[in-house]
Amino acid sequence: MFLAQEVIRKKRDAVSLSDTDIQQFVNGICDDSVSEGQIAALAMAIYFRGMSAQEKTALTVAMRDSGDVLDWRQDNLNGPVLDKHSTGGVGDVVSLMLGPIVAACGGYVPMISGRGLGHTGGTLDKFDAIPGYQTAPDNRRFRDTVKQAGVAIIGQTGRLAPADSRFYATRDVTATVESIPLITASILAKKLAEGLDGLVMDVKAGNGAFMPGYDESRELAQSLVSVGRKLGVETTALITDMNQALGSAAGNAVEVQLAVDYLTGKRRDKRLHQVTKALSAELLVSGNLAKSTDQAEVMVENVLGSGLAAERFAKMVGSLGGPHDFLEKSDQYLPQANLRKPLKLPAEYHGLYLSEVNTRELGMAVVCLGGGRRKADDKLDLSVGMTDILTVGSKVDSESVIATVHASNESDWQEAADSILKALSFSSTPPEPDSVIYERIAGETE
C-alpha cells in the first residue's frame, strides 16, 4: 500500500527511495492523490537530503513517462533528433540560431521551450513578437514542421511531462527551486519526452545566471550529463559565462532581430557566435553528423555562410504560421518601441573601461520596461528592451553608447537608463578578458 507520508519520512531520514517509491509518488502527483503539502514536504526533504544518481534517474523517468513521449520513428526522419537546453540568462538568443544551424547540417530539432520569468528572457516570448507564429500548434503541424524545416520551436503542451508542471509550481512557492536533483529531473523529464538522440546543456555561471556560483553550476552540469547518459541519450554540457549579456540585445523583438542579423550575416556578436558555434558543434558530434568538433565547427560556418541555416529559420517561421517573407522584412513585421534613444555617459567616464556588469540588474531593467515578467501571468510589451549593449573591456569615449534603450515612453526610458547605469562598474585599466566557455562536461561524471 502506497502512503505518501512514508516516502516523505524515508527521505527526511536520509533513507534512499526505491524506484517504486518514486514512481508511486509521481503517479499520486498526476492523479491528485498526493496533496500540495505532501509535494512541498518531499521537495524540502530532497532539498536538504539530496538524491543518489539512481534516485535522480528514477525521478526523471517517472516524470518523463507521466505523459506523452514523442516517437519519431513513424516519421522516417533521415537524421538524428537533437536539442539544446539553456539554464537561462540575459541576451541569450542562441536557440533561435542553433536550431536552424543543426537542421541545415542534417539534424532534426523539436525544441520545446519556455517563457521568461524574472531577469531571464524566454524563447517563446521572443517568438510571440513574430506575427502569426504559433507557439502552440497541433501535433500534426508540429511534426510536419520538424520533418520539413528540420526545426520547430514551440511551447510545452500539457501532455508532455505533466507531473513536472505540478511539482514545479509547488517548488516555485516553497523555496525549493534551487535543488540540483529536482532541477535535473525537471529539465530532463521535459527534454527526454521529446524523443531525443542527443542533448547539449548550456549551463550558465556568473552574476546573471540562475545559479551564479561556479561550483553549483558545475554540479548541475555533471548531474544533467550523468542522468541523461544513464537514460541512453548522448548528453554533454558546456559551462558558459553569464557575467554580462551574451548578445548585444536584450528583450523580445530586439533579440529576434539580432538572430535574423546573425543568420543572414549582417552582424554576429563575437561572444554569441562562440557559444552558438560550440553548442551546435556538440550536437553535430553527438548525433554522428560530424566526426570531430573541428569538422562540426566547419559545418556550422558553411551553413551560415551559404544561407542554408537562414533558409531553415524562414521555413520554420512560415510553417508555424508566421510571414513567409519574415527574413527579408523582419524590421517591418517586428513591433517597434515608441522611443528608441541611445544612453551615453557623461564626460567624467571618458577614458575609463567598462570593468563589470551586474547582469541580473541589466535583465531587470528589461522587466521594468515591460519586456519581462515579475509574475507568471504578466503581459509583456514585446517591443521594448535594449540594443547595442556595450561589452566588458570596452573603453568609453564621447561617442560610446552604453545601450540603445527601446521604451514606450520617456519616463520608462529614464528609469531603465538609471537601472543600467547602476549595473555598470568602470576602472582606469582594462579588465582581464573572461572566457566565454569555461568547461565542457561529458562522459561518466557520477
From Swiss-Prot:
**Quaternary state and interactors:** Homodimer.
Q: What is this protein called?
A: Thymidine phosphorylase
EC number(s) from the headed UniProt entry:
2.4.2.4
Against SMART domains, the record matches this protein to: PYNP_C
Gene Ontology process terms (BP) = pyrimidine nucleobase metabolic process; thymidine metabolic process
Pathway involvement of the protein, from the record: Pyrimidine metabolism; dTMP biosynthesis via salvage pathway; dTMP from thymine: step 1/2
Q: Which gene encodes it?
A: deoA
One GO term describing the cellular component:
cytosol
Q: Which UniProt keywords apply?
A: Glycosyltransferase, Transferase
Catalytic activity of the protein: thymidine + phosphate = 2-deoxy-alpha-D-ribose 1-phosphate + thymine
Q: Which family does it belong to?
A: Belongs to the thymidine/pyrimidine-nucleoside phosphorylase family.
Listed SUPFAM superfamilies:
Nucleoside phosphorylase/phosphoribosyltransferase catalytic domain (SSF52418), Nucleoside phosphorylase/phosphoribosyltransferase N-terminal domain (SSF47648), Pyrimidine nucleoside phosphorylase C-terminal domain (SSF54680)
Pfam families hit by this protein: Glycos_trans_3N, Glycos_transf_3, PYNP_C
- Species of origin reads Idiomarina loihiensis (strain ATCC BAA-735 / DSM 15497 / L2-TR)
PROSITE patterns in the record, alphabetically? THYMID_PHOSPHORYLASE
Q: Which domain of life is it from?
A: Bacteria
Q: Which InterPro entries match?
A: Glycosyl_Trfase_fam3, Glycosyl_Trfase_fam3_N_dom, Glycosyl_Trfase_fam3_N_dom_sf, Nuc_phospho_transferase, PYNP-like_C_sf, PYNP_C, Pyrmidine_PPas_bac/euk, Pyrmidine_PPase_CS
Note whether ATP-binding occurs among the keywords. Answer: no
- Report the protein's function: The enzymes which catalyze the reversible phosphorolysis of pyrimidine nucleosides are involved in the degradation of these compounds and in their utilization as carbon and energy sources, or in the rescue of pyrimidine bases for nucleotide synthesis.
What GO MF terms are annotated? Answer: 1,4-alpha-oligoglucan phosphorylase activity; thymidine phosphorylase activity
